[in-house]
């Protein structure tokens, strides 16, 4: 058993070499993530050190954090002017499926990932009203929904995951889930989804520099490293 379940430190695993970070809150001063430019630059430097190649900055947009597109673009410009490293930086957003999102979607006021892929999230504990209809509306507008960290949604089960994949919804893995950062249940869900090949991309969902430091010190199963998209 030990042979097939051995773990290693994330820092020694090499999983970030050449990787694209698809989900983080490193853009400073716009949500519950990084607040100071200095800390954001330190996080980008750490990404470089561990081998990350591209970073998508995905600040929250929700009713409680109603970021405006123009303001986010301005802050992104300020960060790119201050940053002197080799990472390729992109701006997108993580969109809560709520009333504000419905308004922004109707207006076409969105910040998608590459290829019109739109990072979306829900409450961890209950689904939004008429979720499937909202996802279908996103697709009807020419976007492709990417569900952030599905392993963290306690209201979802295997059947629901399969339904969403049947709707061509992409899944984004939070890599810290595989180390137990969000508790044992999210870890088990993440491992099952990974083994089932349901994830399309991954990220750290980084909100604090200390979280990346803790992630690098954490243990991860060797047997799942090659499955991380």
Give the ranges of each region predicted by the language model.
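A general structural detector for well-ordered alpha-helical segments in enzyme core domains, enriched
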Residues: 39-43, 75-79, 134, 160, ...
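Hydrophobic faces of well-ordered beta-strands that scaffold small-molecule active sites
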Residues: 20-26, 55-57, 89-93, 118-122, ...
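Mid-to-C-terminal alpha-helical segments outside catalytic/metal-binding sites
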Residues: 5, 216-229
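Active-site environment of divalent metal-dependent phosphoester hydrolases
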Residues: 62-65, 96-98, 151-156, 178-181, ...
């Amino acid at each position: 058993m030990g042979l097939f379940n051995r773990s290693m430190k994330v820092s020694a695993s090499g999983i970030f070499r050449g990787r694209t970070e698809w989900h983080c809150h490193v853009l400073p001063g716009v949500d519950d993530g990084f607040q100071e430019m200095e800390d954001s630059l330190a996080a980008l430097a750490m990404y470089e050190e561990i081998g990350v190649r591209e970073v998508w900055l995905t600040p929250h947009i929700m009713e409680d954090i109603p970021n405006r597109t123009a303001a986010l673009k301005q802050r992104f410009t300020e960060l790119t002017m201050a940053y002197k490293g080799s990472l390729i930086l992109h701006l997108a957003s993580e969109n809560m499926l709520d009333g504000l999102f419905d308004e922004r979607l109707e207006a076409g006021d969105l910040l998608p990932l590459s290829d019109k892929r739109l990072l979306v999230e829900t409450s961890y504990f209950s689904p939004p009203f008429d979720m499937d209809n909202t996802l279908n509306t996103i697709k009807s507008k020419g976007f492709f929904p990417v569900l952030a960290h599905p392993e963290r949604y306690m209201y979802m089960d295997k059947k629901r995951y399969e339904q969403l994949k049947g709707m061509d919804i992409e899944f984004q893995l939070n890599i810290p889930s595989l180390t137990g950062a969000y508790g044992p249940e999210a870890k088990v869900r993440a491992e099952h989804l990974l083994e089932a090949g349901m994830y399309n991309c991954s990220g750290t969902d980084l909100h604090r520099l200390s979280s990346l430091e803790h992630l690098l010190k954490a243990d991860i199963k060797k047997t799942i490293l090659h499955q991380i998209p």
